[in-house]
Swiss-Prot record:
Positions bound to ATP: G12, T13, S14, M15, D16, G17, V18, D19
Coiled coil residues, start to end: none
Membrane-crossing segments per the record: none
One of the protein's GO biological processes: peptidoglycan turnover
EC number(s) reported in the record: 2.7.1.170
Family label: Belongs to the anhydro-N-acetylmuramic acid kinase family.
Domain of life per record: Bacteria
Function according to Swiss-Prot or TrEMBL: Catalyzes the specific phosphorylation of 1,6-anhydro-N-acetylmuramic acid (anhMurNAc) with the simultaneous cleavage of the 1,6-anhydro ring, generating MurNAc-6-P. Is required for the utilization of anhMurNAc either imported from the medium or derived from its own cell wall murein, and thus plays a role in cell wall recycling.
Name of this protein: Anhydro-N-acetylmuramic acid kinase
Organism lineage string: Bacteria, Pseudomonadati, Pseudomonadota, Gammaproteobacteria, Alteromonadales
Pathway: Amino-sugar metabolism; 1,6-anhydro-N-acetylmuramate degradation; Cell wall biogenesis; peptidoglycan recycling
Organism of origin: Shewanella putrefaciens (strain CN-32 / ATCC BAA-453)
Reactions this protein catalyses: 1,6-anhydro-N-acetyl-beta-muramate + ATP + H2O = N-acetyl-D-muramate 6-phosphate + ADP + H(+)
Length: 369
């Protein structure tokens, strides 16, 4: 059978690099052929973090960063192809998520905005690009997120097996696969790594808390934890989605101001528990027991996985590796899958997940010609 090669490009709210994956969809399950992470240069990272919050001169900064991110994504593709020794002519299309700089679906006229000019990516790689996956769903009254549950359903669902797929990136999201004819459900639970990363970056200038070791050295403060979990987002009914607009450094500093007597490692432990408790609450609401498979950066945080397991005694906990998908690359593979769905003219959103009025083909095609 002829290969069906697509590339997926993903940079999430954690902004810890651009993941590029080459995936073959010619078989019944996606096959990861090659993967690469392109680091985000510090000057670009600072610009993106600034743009995620309201500020002056936004349109000029947006325009420049849109091109800069497009160039970085193109570099990620070219380095991936060099690493794999695959010719650009063998790739059907690139699926590019872009970099989210605003996600505000709940306004009177909701919107979401991802940058990383697909024209630039197409021009600099010589490969057609499919991008702008979220805004069609928003135009249909949906949240535009999460989009990965449709991929999770096709890849991980099994008859008579109740499964939850938990993706822990900057924001955490769950997909409930009931194993029956019931609707698949999915939504953002709240912060994943974004606040624990922000705190260790602020205090120690380290990019992330490896294995949760710093959090493990601290003691959770119950009063701070209760305050953090009182955020209105956690009591919203799904469909729901969130991002840095709600959970960011400025919000964190505001929450911490009455608790400046706490040790820094105790704050880190409490932030980790905020992530774990908010996830566990939503998982238990979906089903008190079942199988839980974790992907995303959080799957590699030993302390996070241990705390989550303790909060979910009714669940068998593992990573998506047990289902044949490397947890580090799962989201990149999902955006290659979204590109494939667009190329074949197939819908890729789940209205029961996003709240859209109907299924739709997502994304637009940007030709390299």
């Amino acid at each position: 059978m002829k290969n069906a090669y697509y590339i997926g490009l993903m940079s999430g709210t954690s902004m810890d690099g651009v993941d590029a994956v080459l995936v073959d969809f010619s078989g019944p399950q996606p096959q990861l052929i090659c993967s690469h992470t392109e680091a985000i240069p510090s000057h670009l990272l600072k610009g993106l973090q600034r743009l995620c919050l309201p500020g002056a001169d936004e349109i000029n900064r947006l325009g420049r960063l849109d091109r800069n991110v497009g160039q970085l994504f193109a570099l990620a593709v070219n380095n991936l192809l060099a690493k794999c020794n695959i010719a650009k002519e063998d790739i059907i299309a690139i699926g590019s998520h872009g970099q989210t700089v605003r996600h505000m679906p709940n306004l009177e006229v909701g919107f979401t905005l991802q940058i990383g000019d697909p024209n630039t990516i197409a021009t600099e790689t010589g490969i057609d690009v499919i991008a702008d996956f979220r805004r069609k769903d928003i135009a249909l009254g949906g949240q535009g997120a999460p989009l990965v549950p449709a991929f999770h359903q096709q890849t991980f669902a099994e008859i008579d097996k109740k499964r939850i797929i938990l993706n822990i990136g900057g924001i955490a999201n769950v997909t409930y696969l009931p194993g029956t004819s019931e609707h698949v459900l999915g939504f953002d639970t709240g912060p994943g790594n974004t606040l624990i990363d922000a705190w260790i970056q602020h205090v120690k200038s380290e990019p992330f808390d490896k294995n949760g070791e710093w959090a493990a050295s601290g003691k959770t403060n119950p009063d701070l934890l209760a305050q953090l979990l009182s955020h209105p987002y956690f009591s919203l009914a799904y469909p729901k989605s969130t991002g840095r607009e709600l959970f960011n450094q400025a919000w964190l500093e505001q929450q911490l101001s009455p608790f400046n007597h706490l040790d820094e490692e105790d704050i880190q432990s409490t932030l980790l528990d905020m992530t774990c408790h908010s996830i566990a609450r939503d998982v238990i609401k979906l089903s008190p027991e079942g199988e839980l498979f974790v992907c995303g950066g959080g799957a590699f945080n030993t302390q996070l996985m241990q705390r989550l397991a303790a909060l979910l005694p009714g669940y068998k906990l593992d990573t998506t590796s047990a289902l044949g998908v490397d947890p580090k690359w799962a989201e990149g593979i999902a955006f290659a899958w979204l590109a494939m769905r667009n190329h074949l003219g197939l819908p890729a959103n789940l209205p029961a997940v996003t709240g859209a009025s109907r299924e739709a083909v997502l994304g637009g095609r940007f030709s390299a010609k």
